């Protein structure tokens, strides 16, 4: 009898994606993050669903409803903190996943890479809108500052901002629509992730050597299923430790103060995973310039395949490029640190330098380094 998993229309899809999928025999733990992101997304949708059962998207009751979830709902505190810190876990996995793609030249799969960048934008939008929902001080002022950036768009800016707000300031209409969008976006992300996977399976996975691995493939199950389970257990352990021991470590204390339009917090800053982009935004004194730099800091990922000048795909055998890559990583850490600092000397100058290095590194220095390596190898 033919195996049902190979004949049933639905099982066939699962089989070809997670069971009989031919995978390179040498992919390292850096290839675990795709499955970890899938787990994060499922966890976020489930915890979010249970939070939505108790949350009210009204300016008068939003803050109280979150307090009610934490105090009165059975394990509400656990669901809330799993959701909040799950977002941090999501972004840690995202950044590592993108970093892996940059290091090993996975961006040469154009469709997969571009949909990945689109996914990054969608997840960032989802996280931003989710941060507004508890309606604390940082929620309100974060929403005000970030939506206000759109007013930098010439001619239509002001109208666009008021259209997004649903009034003349961030208010009830804004909160209600942000809740609606925050609810729907993760499902769009899930659909996009399906397309991301579809395009990846057209080409097969890349591997650490960057060479063609058609001659040496192994089935995904049991080899990589068991490897993914180990990765998942490590991530779940890390998330559980964070949630159960220091759930507020990554949050802002200001968000425990109910939103007050008449009182601005001394330092408005986003969650840690947006700080690098926030630092780039602040490093340009012009409003429109800052907004453009902010968008380009992520959009630049789309041009990376065009800037690939090396004769080898991966950085595994390219020590100079490796050096440049790790300088870029250090620069991103610097930007993240600067984003959380007040706007004063010397942080402003450090931020401007780090922003300049970020763009120069990607557009100029790394492609030139690759060309030098080609020369050294007489290619």
UniProtKB/Swiss-Prot annotation:
One of its GO terms (molecular function) is ubiquinol-cytochrome-c reductase activity. One of its GO terms (biological process) is mitochondrial electron transport, ubiquinol to cytochrome c. Heme b b566 binds at residues 97, 196. GO terms for cellular component: mitochondrial inner membrane; respiratory chain complex III. A ubiquinone binds at residue 201. Its cofactor is heme b. Belongs to the cytochrome b family. This is Cytochrome b. It comes from Suncus stoliczkanus (Anderson's shrew). The lineage of its organism: Eukaryota, Metazoa, Chordata, Craniata, Vertebrata.
